[in-house]
A protein has these predicted regions:
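Intrinsic disorder at enzyme termini
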Residues: 1-20
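Glycine-rich beta->alpha junctions and the first turn(s) of the following alpha-helix
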Residues: 13-17, 23-24, 183, 204-303
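C-terminal helix-coil-helix/basic helical segment that borders enzyme active sites and/or dimer interfaces
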Residues: 37-45, 271, 275-285, 298-320
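Internal helix-loop-helix
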Residues: 59-129, 169-176, 315-318
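A short, Trp-centered hydrophobic/proline-enriched beta-strand micro-motif
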Residues: 128-136
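Short Gly/Pro-enriched turn/cap motifs at secondary-structure boundaries
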Residues: 140-143, 167-170, 182-185, 211-218
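A structural signal for short hydrophobic beta-strand segments in well-ordered beta-sheet cores
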Residues: 150-153
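A short core secondary-structure module
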Residues: 162-205
C-alpha cells in the first residue's frame, strides 16, 4: 500500500529537527490548543488582551527564549521560530506580542544594555512579569526611520526626551519602553536608544481603537513631553543604525515563521472544508483543480519553512 502522505511535512523539514526542537513545538502546540484557542474568537471580537497570559508565556519559556541567562530557556533559533509558528496558528496577535517582547525589547537590552540594566529588566521581562514595547515608528517616519522627529537633549543628570511614536504594539499595556531618538539638530548619526519606565513624568500612551485585525494585541501611540531620564537609562552600547536593524531582523525572523503557521492553519481549514462539502454528489476535493491548489499552497508553505530553517541555522552560527 502507498505510504500515507504527511501533508504538513512533505519535505521532512520538521521531521529533521532536533528532539529538543520537536518537544518545544509539541509543548507550544498543546498550550495554544488548550489555553489560547478556546477564547480566541471572543477575545478577538471584544479586543480583550489577557495580561495573565504573559506569566504563562514566561513559565513556558516563550519570552526571550534564545537567551542563555537571566532565567531564559536558551533554545535554538529554530525553536524560537517554532514557537512563533505554533502560536500564530491560533492568532497573530499573540505571536506579535511575543515577538515584540523577545526581539525588540529583551534583545536590545541584552545586546546593548549595561550589566545593571540587564539585571534590572531582563528577569522580569523573561518571566512575563513586565511587558515591553519598541518605539521607533512615527507618523512621518515609517519605512525611513532616519526621518524621525523624536529628540533627546543632554542635561546635568541625563537626557530630556520629546516626541511621539505611532502604531506601537504593546504600547498601551507596556511597563518598559525602548525608545529611539536623535539629537536636537536631528543629525542622522546621533541616534541613541533609551529605556523608559511606565509612570515617568511626561510619558503617556493612547490606544488605537477600532482596528480591523490583530484585535487581541493592543496598539497605540507613545507621547513624550519633556521626559527627564537619568543617564543610566541610555542604552550606551548601541552602534548606530545597525543596532536598530539587528532588532528588526530578529523580529522579522519570528514573523516569517509565524505567517507560515497562520498559512498552515488556513490550509487545514480549507482542506477540511473541501473534503466535507458535497457538490454534485461528490466532495469538492474530488476535483483536480482543488487538489492542485492545495498541493501548490503546501509547496509554497514548505519552501518558506525550508528558508526559515536555513536562516535559523545561520543565525545560530552568527552568520547574520
Amino acid at each position: 500500500s502507498m505510504k500515507q502522505n504527511n501533508w504538513f511535512d512533505p519535505f521532512f523539514i520538521l521531521e529533521n529537527l532536533s528532539n529538543e526542537e520537536k518537544l518545544i513545538q509539541k509543548n507550544v502546540k498543546d498550550f495554544s490548543d488548550r489555553v489560547l484557542r478556546p477564547t480566541v474568537v471572543t477575545h478577538n471580537r471584544y479586543h480583550k488582551f489577557d495580561r495573565d497570559l504573559y506569566k504563562e508565556f514566561g513559565q513556558l519559556g516563550l519570552l526571550g527564549s534564545t537567551l542563555k541567562n537571566h532565567g531564559a530557556a536558551g533554545v535554538s533559533s529554530a525553536a524560537y521560530g517554532l514557537i512563533a509558528y505554533e502560536i500564530e496558528k491560533v492568532d497573530s496577535s499573540y505571536r506579535s506580542s511575543i515577538s515584540v517582547q523577545s526581539s525588540l525589547v529583551i534583545h536590545p537590552i541584552d545586546s546593548f544594555g549595561s550589566n545593571e540594566q540587564k539585571q534590572r529588566y531582563l528577569p522580569k521581562l523573561i518571566s512575563g512579569e513586565k511587558i515591553g514595547c519598541f518605539g521607533l515608528t512615527e507618523s512621518e517616519a515609517g519605512s525611513d526611520p532616519s526621518s524621525m522627529k523624536t529628540t533627546y537633549k543632554k542635561n546635568q543628570n541625563g537626557y530630556i526626551l520629546n516626541g511621539s511614536k505611532n502604531w506601537i504594539t504593546n504600547a498601551p499595556i507596556a511597563d518598559v519602553f525602548i525608545i529611539w531618538a536623535l539629537n536636537e539638530k536631528l543629525e542622522t548619526n546621533s541616534i541613541k536608544g533609551f529605556i523608559l519606565n511606565k509612570g515617568t513624568k511626561g510619558l503617556s500612551t493612547s490606544t488605537i481603537e477600532n482596528k480591523t485585525s490583530l484585535k487581541i494585541s493592543p496598539t497605540g501611540q507613545i507621547i513624550m513631553q519633556d521626559v527627564a531620564i537619568d543617564k543610566s537609562n541610555c542604552l550606551e552600547n548601541t552602534k548606530g543604525w545597525s543596532s536598530i536593524f539587528s532588532c528588526l531582523n530578529k523580529a522579522r525572523f519570528g514573523i516569517s515563521w509565524g505567517v507560515l503557521g497562520a498559512a498552515s492553519e488556513c490550509w487545514l481549514i480549507a482542506k477540511d472544508y473541501v473534503e466535507n462539502r458535497i457538490m454534485f454528489k461528490k466532495p469538492l476535493a474530488a476535483n483536480q483543480l482543488i487538489q492542485k491548489k492545495l498541493a501548490d499552497i503546501q509547496t509554497e508553505i514548505n519552501l518558506g519553512l525550508a528558508a526559515c530553517n536555513l536562516t535559523a541555522k545561520a543565525m545560530d552560527k552568527n552568520q547574520d
